[in-house]
Structure formats: structure tokens, C-alpha cells
Amino acid sequence: MQDPQTEQSYRIAIGCDDAAFAMKDAMIAHLEERGHTVTDLSATPDEDYPDVAERVARSVARGEHERAVLVCGTGIGMAIAANKVPGIRAAQIPDSYSAERARKSNDAQIACFGSRTIGVHAALVCLDHWLVSDFAGGGSAPKVEKIKQVESRNLVVPA
């Protein structure tokens, strides 16, 4: 893994629901310490995780942020909701290998974490692995292209 201190810096959106404020705050401090620009788009008291996931994913889809991090209880709901935004590939990250592969094989722009399923230290290690990994292309490129084709065929809900 590349040294996290010498990695490229990104504009990163981050969002969480009420289950994950402590992990989100630790991630913001970690990311800013490494030179990233972080925008907190977390839930307000009247919002649920799908609202946050959509707001964060749209910011990536519009090019306002290059990467994003979403945190809820498991990371699953955030990933499902974020993946509803066209052009977004969000991955739930349970371990460092998955974090690396989410970027290298799937070109995931959004990493989703579960505050109730992974500890803060492990999540920060995974976050570093995800941030220093780049899309490898190669044999994965045609598969990511197929994901984009599936998405474009299904932008209109079938009757």
C-alpha cells in the first residue's frame, strides 16, 4: 500500500446518519490530517440515511467531490441508496482487501462503512487502503463498462 501521507489529496464528501456520528468525526479528522478537503453532508435531525446517501452521491456524480464516504449502522443501506444515483458505484467496505478491490476492480467512488460492524481503527485502515488504490483497468475495465451499460438500460423503469 502507498504511504497514506504521500497520497494524492481529494475533495471528499462525507455523510452519516444518527448511528455513526462518532465514526464520521474520526474519519473527518483522519482525512484532514492527510491533506484532503472534506465536506460534511451528514443528516439533520429530520433526515434518514437515504437522504444523506442521495445528497452525497449526487455531489460525486456532479463532480463537486472526487470521492465520498458514507457511514450508517452497517453501511449496507447507504450503499444501496447511493447506488440509485446514475453514475455512482458505492461499495460497502468490511475489510482492507475489499477496500482495495472496490477501487482497483470496481472503480467505486464511494466507500460505505458500518459503525456497528467495524471498529474505528479498522475503518480508518480500510479508508486508507481505499484512498490509495486506483482503478486498475485491465480485465476489470470491460466489467465496469458492463455495469454502466446495465445502468443506462435501466434508467427508465420497465413497465
Go through the PLM ranges and name each one:
Residues 25-28, 80-84, 124:
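Short amphipathic alpha-helical segments
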Residues 13-33, 38:
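Glycine-rich phosphate/diphosphate-binding loop of Rossmann-like nucleotide-binding domains
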Residues 34, 86-88, 106:
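Short, structured coil segments at secondary-structure junctions
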Residues 15, 39-42, 68-72:
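Short, conserved beta-strand edge motifs with alternating hydrophobic and charged residues
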Residues 52, 56-93:
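Helix-adjacent hinge/juxtasegments
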Residues 5-15, 19-20, 96-159:
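C-terminal binding/interaction regions
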